[in-house]
UniProtKB/Swiss-Prot annotation:
EC category: hydrolase
Gene3D superfamilies (alphabetical): Uracil-DNA glycosylase-like domain (3.40.470.10)
GO biological process annotation, one example: base-excision repair, AP site formation via deaminated base removal
Xref: CDD domains: UDG-F1-like
Record's keyword terms, sorted: Cytoplasm, DNA damage, DNA repair, Hydrolase
Keyword Mitochondrion: no
Organism lineage: Bacteria, Pseudomonadati, Campylobacterota, Epsilonproteobacteria, Campylobacterales
UniProt-annotated catalytic positions: 72 (proton acceptor)
InterPro entries: UDG_fam1, Ura-DNA_Glyclase_AS, Uracil-DNA_glycosylase-like, Uracil-DNA_glycosylase-like_sf
Catalytic activity: Hydrolyzes single-stranded DNA or mismatched double-stranded DNA and polynucleotides, releasing free uracil
GO molecular function, one term: uracil DNA N-glycosylase activity
Protein name according to UniProt: Uracil-DNA glycosylase
Main location: cytoplasm
Compartmental location: Cytoplasm
Length: 230
């Protein structure tokens, strides 16, 4: 039972400290109850429970340099791994991720990776957060009323409040709505259309990968190696 109480929540220590008050609020109890009720009903939930907080565990609070925001996890088998847009090696690339790779190649000349595992980005300080952290198999958005967004909004607000110089990549209208949580006098906000094919070609040409590195370089920080290891 991954969310039984604060002591048993499997989340990276720096994030656990930053968000400790959230875990004690009534809404988090509601998330826990909704999640456990869905699980006990026999529904298949994604990502697997140990990966619910994967974005937090792979990118400690004090190491966050950039943020990519997604909406909710992939809802087909074997796809969701707790990082927005990312899928495990061996899983077919979703259409949105294929477009991310196309823009990466256009922007920086990096050929598309043969896999969709973005763990390397997360380990370099790219916080790859879905606003909603769980979903039922085959039912996109099925957990949007659980209260996850209150929790993930708190994470975004904490980054804005406690850090400076973070680059926020907001792709699509859903992500763009989160800009109200971000202090643009302390951080950089890069916006564009979503990489989904439904957005047409409006995502292409945003140059967000090179722009992120330019900003980090000016700030004296190590640039992100966007090329994924095979």
């Amino acid at each position: 039972m991954i969310m039984a109480d604060l002591e048993r929540i499997k989340i990276e220590p720096s994030w656990k400290e930053v968000l400790k008050e959230e875990f004690t609020k009534p809404y988090f109890d509601s998330i826990r109850e909704s999640y456990l009720q869905a699980k006990s009903s026999g529904a298949i939930l994604y990502p697997p429970a140990p990966l619910l907080f994967n974005a937090f565990n792979l990118t400690p609070f004090d190491q966050v340099k950039a943020v990519i925001l997604g909406q909710d996890p992939y809802h087909a088998p074997h796809q969701a791994m707790g990082l927005c847009f990312s899928v495990p090696k061996g899983v077919a690339l979703p259409a949105s991720l294929r477009n991310v790779y196309k823009e990466l190649e256009r922007d920086l000349g990096i050929p598309p990776a043969k896999h969709g595992d973005l763990t390397s980005w997360a380990k370099q300080g790219v916080f790859m957060l879905n606003a909603i952290l769980s979903v039922e198999q085959g039912k996109a958005g099925s957990h949007q009323k659980f209260g996850w967004q209150t929790f993930t909004d708190a994470a975004i607000s904490a980054l804005s409040r406690k850090k400076k110089g973070v680059v926020f990549l907001l792709w699509g209208n859903f992500a763009r709505e989160k800009r109200v949580l971000i202090d643009s006098t302390k951080h950089t906000i890069l916006e564009s259309a979503h990489p989904s094919p439904l957005a047409g070609n409006r995502y292409f040409g945003n140059g967000h990968f090179s722009k992120t590195n330019e900003i980090l370089k000016v700030q004296g920080e190590r640039e992100i190696l966007w090329r994924l290891p095979e």
